[in-house]
A protein has these predicted regions:
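Propeptide-to-catalytic entry region of secreted or membrane-anchored zinc metalloproteases
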Residues: 1-79, 112
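Short pre-active-site segment immediately N-terminal to the catalytic Zn-binding motif
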Residues: 2-5, 100-125
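Extracellular/periplasmic catalytic domains that process cell-envelope and extracellular macromolecules
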Residues: 23-26, 81-86, 103, 229-230, ...
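Structural recognition of the beta-strand scaffold that forms the well-ordered cores
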Residues: 30-33, 88-92, 120-121, 127-131, ...
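Solvent-exposed loop/turn segments at secondary-structure junctions
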Residues: 37-41, 95-99, 115-117, 135-136, ...
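Catalytic zinc-binding patch centered on the HExxH motif and its immediate surroundings
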Residues: 42-45, 74-111
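Catalytic Zn2+-binding segment of zinc metalloproteases
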Residues: 125-141
Length: 286
């Protein structure tokens, strides 16, 4: 299946380089593709009784999340990666079930045959490449909620303890209030219905096409809700981020790190990504 891997890799890399700031900085990247042979095709998904002997041990259901794809076999992963010079790694897994994962400074993953692989590839690479936080908060995550709202280290979320010291204040749009109002209640009501149906699809082990249809409907509804407010497209501090509906804020109403909508990285995320590109392409600032 080497030819399939090459087609998938070229397709997904081209999508990454269609997004800013990668689009403008494509010349600063070298991309290598490695296609190690596996004993069996496909990827493990223990929650549905599927187990595969893959070369690097990638699997769904990481940390109990059915969509979270990781490998815990670091030695095998590093053995494969050592055949090319690398700073960043994206692992393509041979599956069509929605899923992926991204860990800052380690690797990111995506199910290459999923309808949503273009989005997941870019979103998860944002985690891996620049330590971007998840801005969504209405779907289940593999992490426990926090009792305290400490200021996160990630560049694109804040606890907004002191609006005057907002970490992205240099990008703040003029005359934008903090916190910044948006159609939060309407968004959450819609999301609750979607998440209920999402869980039922997985519990009933229904075809992946039904999940794809649900996500497509969600995308239409969310695009209708977002993007039409007074502060849509503005940089502010919109409550709801990092798996929490209260107490954490994101820079813009919508972003690749928030929804599957047809939107770019927000300006704060773009700035964070650009800093990492500069670090590797130009060296540290003196």
């Amino acid at each position: 299946q080497r030819s399939k891997f090459e087609k998938d890799a070229r397709r997904l890399v081209s999508i990454l380089f269609s997004k800013s700031p990668f689009k403008e900085r494509k010349q600063d990247f070298n991309v290598w593709g490695l296609c190690p042979e596996s004993r069996e095709p496909g990827i493990s998904r223990p929650s549905t009784g599927i187990h595969r002997r893959s070369r690097i041990g990638a699997t769904y259901d990481a940390f109990g999340s059915e969509r979270y794809v990781l490998t815990f076999d670091n030695r095998s992963f590093r053995d494969v990666a050592s055949f090319a010079p690398y700073e960043f790694v994206e692992i393509l897994v041979n599956g069509n079930t929605y899923g992926g994962g991204g860990i800052f400074g380690l690797y990111s993953t995506v199910a290459a045959d999923s309808l949503w692989s273009p989005y997941v590839f870019v979103h998860e690479f944002g985690h891996h490449f620049a330590g971007l936080a998840d801005e969504y908060y209405t779907s289940d995550s593999a992490y426990l909620p926090t009792a305290d709202r400490l200021e996160p280290w990630e560049p694109n979320v804040t606890a907004l303890k002191d609006p005057k010291q907002l970490k992205w204040k240099a990008l703040l749009s003029p005359d934008t209030p903090l916190p910044t109002p948006w159609r939060k209640d309407e968004f959450e009501a819609d999301s609750r219905a979607i998440q209920t149906e999402r869980k039922k699809i997985r519990a009933d082990r229904r075809p992946e096409s039904e999940m794809d249809a649900l996500f497509t409907r969600e995308k239409t509804e969310v695009s209708r809700i977002l993007g039409t407010d007074q502060y849509s497209g503005k940089v502010g501090a919109f409550e709801g981020a990092m798996y929490e509906p209260r107490g954490y804020f994101r820079p813009e109403e919508d972003c690749i790190m928030f929804t599957r909508d047809e939107v770019p990285f927000c300006r704060v995320c773009q700035a964070a990504l650009s800093r990492i590109i500069d670090l590797y392409a130009r060296g540290p600032e003196k």
